[in-house]
């Protein structure tokens, strides 16, 4: 029954029935562990891969000895955000240069660039912006077998050998039973050609190797080569057509393709998958032995002929070093060949993990070492094993692997082995931050290696130093490029704490080396049975990326090979049917071998299954089994879903499509001024807030000594003082407000890990994305048609859904060719009234209220001028630069924006701030707005029930309860049945009862309150059991006809606010080529009157309207200015002229070499002006709202050298790239020429009226 649960500082009444035996892991460990692993091991591995670099003669040897990243970063995290710097520490590498001729050894420590560090919360600060590296789901290296059925109904098998890097090998069978191979995506060859090239030259050797199989015989027949040499030459001809083939070069080519660790790399996961797939044990168990199987060392028979091989015996066979087994299948003997790898534990007495071996090793190498060091003690063996670890666990493919993989494809047609499913999570792995960085670092180092080699040949051998050989630029560039512009390095979604957390746990199948949106079919995107407990089946974007981007499940973790594991409770083998508290993490392919019970299966006190038959999962099926057959049990019902999904109460009663929207919309909830945790929660809110990193946690236990809005001081047990600084009104990446508030009092005792301050969207340490409001499900005068929402004015008056949004504006004073720009209060042609809030330097004061068009930073730019005469130059020289012409390029508040200036930051060269080249001063102004909820804003519940506010009713008109309480929100009941998200109705019922009892409740997903529980809680609260109530119409006081479902629902205000979307324009910028208005709010564009709209006007015969829209309101350059003047002066609108698109058409025809002339009705030729500028000069009126056409070469003359810094990727903004004539340095200015202003024009035509 319902019981209290303590979550942090809060107590919730929980309806859960299952005791969870394991705590949830830290939710951002996927980021942190991966990065730490990279710092510890990744660097070493990469350096080991490039070591040593030798010159072409082998005389100079350069090796990387050691590295350090210990120095503290130059700036703290907060300073980096403020200064647009990267949070990074210097990477120093110790390099040794050995000259073999002279025996001279030089060592030097070399700085290899700044390496970005991860913050406490799992993010990176790159150029001042907080970014997240998303983990990538890719196909694991390994061997994959597939089957297709041809027209005759025959099974054809094929396989692909995929390395981490290197050439692919693909085998296939055709309908004539001929086996062929493609090497590195070239044309097909008979497979026996490859086998011959590997050293099995004659037909006899091949048939002895694989047995007398019809496929092998058919292939031999088709194969034109007959010896090893011929095989090698045949392969060489295929791969290097046009070069003279020799046996030597062919051998070298084959070796370079597959057996050179520098060019062919399986990586750890690849070797692991190879051994798993090709191991003889996995292939023979369950089959009948065709001959006696003997231990090669002792000669004893492990399995006798005709005996069925058990799993245990199969393991024994493999570890005894038996590599070939004859099986009897349907009366035929079939030969199965393994890849000769054994478990080292059977051969040595110590634990091989001590020396870093935890996979199978190559038998022949192991035997060689053990023979050599027999009787010399364990330490000698350990040392020898460590020295030859690359031979024991080869990183490249081996000859045995290739032979074994061919044996596998032959065995498949006898039913030995199995084909693979590429979408199974056992065959897909994660590349997390660490590995992605390691790959990038490797690319940088290999580019550097080339440079080092070249320099070794050029430089004087006697005086050469490591520093002179090494150029760190390629390394620094590779890292910078990865963080700045990789598809997987993303600008952090910081709308609210849940958005941050989810972003760090995201799994993407896109990105370099992954899939592309266009190529991904349905299968890849589908939910797969192996996703259970690893990847959330609910949370994924709607749209083109659906199914390609997922989210890690709550309990999942990533193992050392990059496969996702999920925890299970072990069922005791000694007492079948009894569940222990031992936790085992399984990967997807391990899980496929076991039968697993659900977490909500009832157990008795001792942990035994109560039912005689238990519904379980086995692979992709649900089966009913006896309790004694069960191997594992789920640890928690919420282990299958992600964090965001597990925050939806009554998820089990919602349709999956709507739950998907609910999970995604929680990430878009805007932080409100006053937060309030949900009455109906799921109990995960506390953990999510704690791990998201927005709340402050006490580092050490102690007593609170001082609390202010800005800092908390805690005196620890050993008398030290810990000071915690709080963030106040900072701007997030998405423009929402980050603000922390203390929740402890002076004198309070705290433990380490306790929440001591709330962040945005958290309440008392729990995530609080919205508000609990009283809703009723009823229609009201059609105002909630089509999911619209009717709200009470109380939500506006009491600031229930009010949020703060902070916008950042920046102005920089640069050096131009005509002289430096100046930030100043002296601006030409600006009234004193417009300058009233600027200080003496021309920068707005903090606290000033600003509207659209107000000046934030006064700035003037020198104007271009004609060549001066000698006299003028002399006067200039005598009287200084005062007479210079300047134009106003001040930073103004853009159209439609307003607010209060909350902060101003000034960076100058004089103060030692690092600025971009050519910038002398940078000013950042932060403007905050309080946005109350308004008509047009989007709101949503947690069940995918979203809508737009259609009307705000006065409180007195809202329907009210019998005790006089008015509703806050009226929702449409028709939004529930067809969408099948019944969870919202249950939430409302439970919220109604819980509010009446003064409870906050937790109803965990798949383990929450049942209908019975809700009815009982309603009864306990003294409310009607159906959760309905009589409502009275606020306007008349009459009761409504039927009783209405009312209760408390948790509603979110989403980031789609109407203020950011509404937009109007009378005149503004035009596109350069077509002279039509630009489009979109960002460009201050117009509304497109498209083809279909034109048809509508044509259909009505509205000729004049149509003419106007196609000419003066669009691209008739002269006509639109004349029309504008006519409106201002109150005259009649003139006749339209020739639209620009007509001129463009003529130009297009002329470009096809057609001589086109234009004639009037009187047969007179009309001169078409060549360029718009000719027209504009005659008109001398500018309605575009900017001073003059943008000059692209203003700051970068062809003569100037463009430096790397100018091309910084970060500086690009997509909106700047949208149109060719928008220059990011030019603020679009909607001011009109002064001489045009007329008082009544100003009154009648106002932006607010639009």
UniProtKB/Swiss-Prot annotation:
Keywords: DNA-directed RNA polymerase, Nucleotidyltransferase, Transcription, Transferase. It comes from Acetivibrio thermocellus (strain ATCC 27405 / DSM 1237 / JCM 9322 / NBRC 103400 / NCIMB 10682 / NRRL B-4536 / VPI 7372) (Clostridium thermocellum). One of its GO terms (cellular component) is DNA-directed RNA polymerase complex. The keyword Transferase applies. Signal peptide: none annotated. Pfam families: RNA_pol_Rpb2_1 (PF04563), RNA_pol_Rpb2_2 (PF04561), RNA_pol_Rpb2_3 (PF04565), RNA_pol_Rpb2_45 (PF10385), RNA_pol_Rpb2_6 (PF00562), RNA_pol_Rpb2_7 (PF04560). Gene3D superfamilies: 2.40.50.100, 2.40.50.150, 3.90.1100.10, DNA-directed RNA polymerase, beta subunit, external 1 domain, DNA-directed RNA polymerase, subunit 2, domain 6, RNA polymerase alpha subunit dimerisation domain, RNA polymerase Rpb2, domain 2. SUPFAM superfamilies: beta and beta-prime subunits of DNA dependent RNA-polymerase. It comes from the Bacteria. This is DNA-directed RNA polymerase subunit beta. Residues 1215-1250 are annotated as: Disordered. InterPro entries: DNA-dir_RNA_pol_bsu_ext_1_sf, DNA-dir_RNA_pol_bsu_external_1, DNA-dir_RNA_pol_su2, DNA-dir_RNAP_su2_dom, DNA-dir_RNAP_su2_hyb_sf, RNA_pol_bsu_bac, RNA_pol_bsu_CS, RNA_pol_bsu_protrusion. DNA-dependent RNA polymerase catalyzes the transcription of DNA into RNA using the four ribonucleoside triphosphates as substrates. Its EC number is 2.7.7.6.
């Amino acid at each position: 029954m319902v019981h209290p649960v303590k979550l942090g500082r809060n107590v919730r009444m929980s309806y859960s029935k299952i005791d969870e035996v394991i705590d949830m892991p830290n939710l951002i460990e996927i980021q942190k562990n991966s990065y730490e692993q990279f710092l510890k091991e990744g660097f070493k591995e990469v350096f080991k891969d490039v070591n040593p670099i030798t010159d072409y003669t082998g005389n100079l040897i350069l090796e990387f000895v050691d590295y350090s990243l210990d120095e503290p970063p130059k700036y703290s995290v907060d300073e980096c955000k403020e200064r647009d710097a990267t949070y990074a520490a210097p990477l120093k590498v110790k390099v040794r240069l050995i000259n073999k001729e002279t025996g001279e050894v030089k060592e030097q420590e070399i700085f290899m660039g700044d390496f970005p560090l991860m913050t406490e919360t799992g993010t990176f600060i790159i150029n001042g912006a907080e970014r997240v590296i998303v983990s990538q789901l890719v196909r694991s290296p390994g061997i994959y077998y597939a089957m297709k059925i041809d027209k005759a109904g025959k099974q054809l098998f094929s396989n692909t050998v995929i390395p981490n890097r290197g050439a692919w090998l693909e085998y296939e069978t055709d309908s004539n039973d001929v086996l062929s191979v493609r090497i590195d995506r070239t044309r097909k060859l008979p497979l026996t050609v490859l086998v011959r090239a590997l050293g099995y030259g004659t037909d006899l050797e091949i048939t002895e190797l694989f047995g007398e199989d019809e496929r092998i015989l058919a292939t031999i027949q088709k194969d034109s080569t007959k010896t090893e040499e011929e095989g090698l030459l045949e392969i060489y001809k295929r791969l290097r057509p046009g070069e003279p083939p020799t046996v030597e070069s062919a051998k070298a080519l084959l070796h370079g393709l597959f057996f050179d660790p520098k060019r062919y790399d399986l990586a750890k996961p690849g070797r692991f998958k190879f051994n798993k797939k090709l191991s003889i044990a996995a292939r023979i168990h369950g089959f009948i032995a065709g001959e006696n199987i003997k231990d090669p060392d002792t000669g004893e028979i492990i399995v006798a002929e005709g005996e069925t091989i058990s799993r245990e015996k199969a393991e024994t066979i493999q570890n005894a070093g038996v590599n070939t087994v004859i099986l009897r299948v349907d009366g035929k003997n079939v030969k199965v060949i393994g890849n000769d790898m054994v478990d080292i534990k059977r051969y040595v007495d110590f634990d091989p993990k001590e020396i870093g071996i935890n996979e199978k090793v190559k038998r022949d190498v192991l035997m060689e070492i053990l023979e050599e060091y027999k009787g010399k003690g364990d330490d000698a063996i350990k040392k020898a094993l460590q020295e030859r670890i690359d031979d024991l666990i080869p990183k490249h493919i081996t000859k045995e692997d290739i032979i074994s993989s061919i044996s596998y494809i032959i065995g498949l047609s006898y039913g030995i082995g199995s084909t693979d499913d590429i979408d199974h999570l056992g065959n897909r792995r994660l590349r997390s931050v660490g590995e992605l960085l390691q790959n990038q670092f490797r690319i940088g180092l290999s580019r550097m290696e080339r440079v080092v080699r070249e320099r070794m040949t050029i430089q004087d051998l006697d005086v050469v130093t490591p520093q002179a050989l090494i150029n760190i630029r390629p390394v620094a560039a590779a890292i910078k490029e990865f963080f700045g512009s990789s598809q997987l390095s993303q600008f952090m979604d910081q709308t609210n704490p849940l958005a941050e957390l989810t972003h760090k746990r995201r799994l993407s199948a896109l990105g370099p080396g992954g899939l592309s949106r266009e190529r991904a079919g349905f299968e890849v995107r589908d939910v797969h049975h192996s996703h259970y407990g690893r990847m959330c089946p609910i949370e994924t974007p709607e749209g083109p990326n659906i199914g390609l981007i997922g989210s890690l499940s709550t309990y999942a973790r990533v193992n050392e090979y990059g496969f996702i594991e999920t925890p299970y409770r072990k069922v005791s083998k000694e007492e079948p049917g009894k569940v222990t508290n031992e936790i085992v993490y399984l990967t997807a392919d391990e899980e496929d071998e076991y039968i697993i019970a659900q977490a909500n299966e009832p157990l008795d006190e001792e942990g035994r299954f109560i039912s005689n038959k238990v519904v379980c999962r086995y692979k992709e099926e649900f089966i009913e089994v006896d309790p004694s057959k069960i191997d594992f049990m789920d640890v928690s019902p919420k282990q299958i879903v992600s964090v965001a999904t597990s925050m939806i109460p009554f998820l089990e009663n919602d349709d999956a499509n709507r739950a998907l929207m609910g999970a995604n919309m929680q990430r878009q909830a805007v932080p409100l001024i006053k937060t309030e945790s949900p009455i109906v929660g799921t109990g995960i809110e506390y953990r999510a807030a704690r791990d998201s990193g927005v709340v402050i946690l006490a580092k050490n236990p102690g007593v609170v000594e001082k609390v202010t809005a800005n800092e908390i001081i805690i005196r620890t047990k050993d008398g030290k003082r810990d000071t915690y600084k709080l963030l106040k009104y900072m701007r997030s990446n998405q423009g929402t407000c980050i603000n922390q508030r203390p929740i402890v009092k002076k004198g309070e005792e705290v433990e380490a890990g306790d929440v001591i301050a709330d962040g945005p969207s958290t309440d008392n340490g729990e995530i609080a994305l919205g508000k609990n409001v009283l809703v009723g499900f009823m229609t009201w005068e059609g105002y909630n048609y089509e999911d619209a929402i009717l709200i009470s004015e109380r939500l506006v008056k009491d600031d229930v859904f009010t949020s703060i949004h902070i916008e950042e504006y920046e102005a920089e004073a640069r050096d131009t060719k005509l002289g430096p720009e100046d930030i100043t209060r002296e601006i030409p042609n600006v009234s004193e009234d417009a300058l009233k809030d600027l200080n003496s330097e021309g920068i707005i004061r903090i606290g000033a209220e600003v509207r659209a068009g107000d000046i934030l930073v006064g700035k003037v730019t020198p104007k271009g001028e004609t060549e001066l005469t000698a006299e003028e130059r002399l006067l200039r020289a005598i009287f200084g630069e005062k007479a210079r012409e300047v134009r106003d390029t001040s930073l103004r508040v853009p159209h439609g924006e307003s607010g209060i200036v909350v902060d101003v930051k000034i960076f100058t060269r004089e103060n030692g701030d690092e600025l971009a080249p050519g910038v002398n001063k940078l000013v950042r102004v932060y403007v905050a707005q309080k946005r109350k909820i308004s008509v047009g804003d989007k709101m949503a519940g947690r069940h995918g029930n979203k809508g737009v506010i259609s009307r705000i009713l006065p409180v007195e008109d809202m329907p009210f309860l019998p005790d006089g309480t008015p509703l806050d929100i009226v929702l449409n009941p028709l939004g529930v049945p067809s969408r099948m998200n019944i969870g919202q109705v249950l939430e409302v019922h439970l919220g109604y009862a819980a509010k009446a009892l003064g409870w906050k409740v937790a109803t965990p997903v798949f383990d929450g309150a049942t209908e019975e529980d809700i009815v009982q809680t309603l009864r306990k609260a003294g409310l009607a059991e159906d959760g309905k109530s009589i409502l009275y119409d606020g306007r008349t006081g009459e009761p409504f006809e039927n009783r209405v479902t009312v209760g408390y629902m948790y509603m979110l205000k989403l980031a789609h606010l109407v203020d950011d979307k509404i937009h109007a324009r009378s005149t503004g910028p035009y596109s350069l080529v077509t002279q039509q208005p630009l489009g979109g709010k960002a460009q201050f564009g117009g509304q497109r009157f498209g083809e279909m709209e034109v048809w509508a006007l044509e259909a009505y015969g509205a000729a004049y309207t149509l003419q106007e829209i196609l000419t003066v309101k669009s691209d008739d350059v002269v006509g639109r200015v004349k029309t504008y003047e006519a409106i201002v002066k109150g005259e009649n609108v003139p006749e339209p002229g020739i639209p620009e698109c007509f001129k463009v058409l003529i130009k297009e025809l002329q470009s096809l070499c057609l001589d086109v002339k234009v004639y009037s009705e009187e047969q007179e030729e009309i001169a078409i002006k060549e360029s718009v500028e000719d027209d504009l000069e005659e008109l001398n009126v500018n309605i575009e709202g900017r001073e003059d056409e943008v000059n692209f070469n203003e700051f970068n003359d062809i003569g100037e050298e463009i430096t790397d810094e100018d091309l910084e990727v970060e500086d690009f903004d997509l909106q700047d790239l949208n149109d060719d004539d928008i220059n990011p340095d030019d603020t679009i200015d909607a001011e009109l020429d002064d001489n045009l202003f007329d008082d009544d024009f100003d009154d009648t035509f106002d932006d607010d009226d639009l």
